[in-house]
Amino acid sequence: MNETDDAPLHARVRLFLCGDVMTGRGIDQILPHPGAPRLYERYCRSARDYVRLAERANGELPARVDCAYPWGDALAELDRVRPHVRIVNLETAITTSDARWPDKAVLYRMHPRNVGCVSSARIDCCVLANNHSLDWGREGLADTLDTLRRAGIRTASAGDDDAHAARPATLGVAPGRRVLVYAYAAETSGVPPSWAATPRRGGLNYLADLSSGRATQIGERIAAQRREGDLVVVSLHWGGNWGFEIGDDEHAFAHRLIDTGAADIVYGHSSHHVKGIEIYRERLILYGCGDCLNDYEGIHGHQPFRPDLALMYFPVLDAGSGALVELSAVPMQIRNLRLQRAPADGKAWLHAVLERESRRFGTHVSACDVDGLHVHW
């Protein structure tokens, strides 16, 4: 748990959530202990190519940076807001394994000695339910789990069998007060069924479909496990990488998790850009948080989605009821493979897009000079 001087813990709990944290490939190459750079992509055969692309776009990078470097201005924001709990979707394996997943071309890995890139932001929980956690096989997943465990960072959605993978990360915030993080890797995000954990095989907490029956089953299971005083985050890696559309099945699935009493926050990710926000029955639904850290700098083809922009989400929940009390989001830009405060045009773009995409849910967004964007409902 991270200390905070915010409202008393018995009254409110503030969280930090963000989208995909992709610290492998190009970012790993500038950290103190870069892993083997070999890639198997059609256009790039070395992770160093992504460093060169970033330099071509925005100037020379240091040959080596410290592990905190990629977080840049985000660290000051975290110090300012002081959330009780910090949760990210870590979309890279932490391993030196060379046993890449067969027939998979786009692979992410970070050297285990660079785990400080995660711990420097004092992250409490890494969600591993995504389509890169097994890029380097089950050996790579085991290395990731072991490295994070030794760093004192909890994980959700992955384990050495299905029971372990289904277990929530339990984050204590005060006596009798916990935040539980359940996480699911949906087939719709490109996670293959073979990555599912089984009674005899390690893997992910796999979500085969977004049916009403599946949502009810998951929701009732979580509702039965939560105790009085618990707050529950349900993390879903779902949908494609590009496009603002929110499917009817995603909408209904999120609602069902809340209707069953399972989720206080539905924390969605996979899209490389922000998507709409809904407040349903006083519960927060983030349909797509966008990327937080990536090495896409200098890559062309998706500029209309502004993959260089990121949001730091800071929801505040009523500790007694789980209801959303307030939500702010701080705009960032990825430049020189690190987070910096978004320039005025970037902040305006995020404001306009969030307002446009959230309006259908009765959610509205306003800009504030102090801490970025405020969400209203």
Q: Which stretches of residues belong to each language-model region?
A:
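Acidic, metal/ion-coordinating pockets
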Residues: M1-W377
